[in-house]
Amino acid sequence: RGMRQRAALARALTMDSQVLLMDEPFSALDKQTKNILRDEIEKIWMETKKTVVFVTHSVEEAVFFGTSVVLMGVYPGGIRKIVPIELERPRQIDSKEFVELRAELLKLLRKEVEKVAKQAG
């Protein structure tokens, strides 16, 4: 499955469209395959510079790929915050800046979940 997913993502990035939507592209992959594919996709993206709308529930994926992260609210739905991602490329997931930004986004998400739980409760 990982090889097919890798080939499909590579084909999508090399297509001639100006905008590419990637909706949870790594969700069915194991961690090792995700890491390999993530690095390959980043290389291809850096060469093509396509606009990619990357939908994910993974904060790590969002920080790794994004130029900005759009945090969505649960109820009522909508954009809660747009966070610019200004980390240099290639990105290192173990760098201090990456870890701090991931923690900041997780904190914002937690606040949103707590707010919704309080309203429901």
Language-model features: locations:
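Conserved catalytic segment of ABC-fold P-loop ATPases
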Residues: F64-L71
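Conserved H-loop
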Residues: K49-V55
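Conserved beta-strand-loop-alpha-helix hinge in the C-terminal portion
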Residues: V74-E104
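Conserved signature/switch motifs of ABC ATPase nucleotide-binding domains
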Residues: M15
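ABC ATPase nucleotide-binding domain "signature motif"
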Residues: R1-R6, M46
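Hydrophobic anchor residue at the start of the ABC signature
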Residues: L9
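Helical segment within the ABC ATPase nucleotide-binding domain
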Residues: K34-K49
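Catalytic Walker B motif of ABC-type/P-loop ATPase nucleotide-binding domains
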Residues: L20-D23
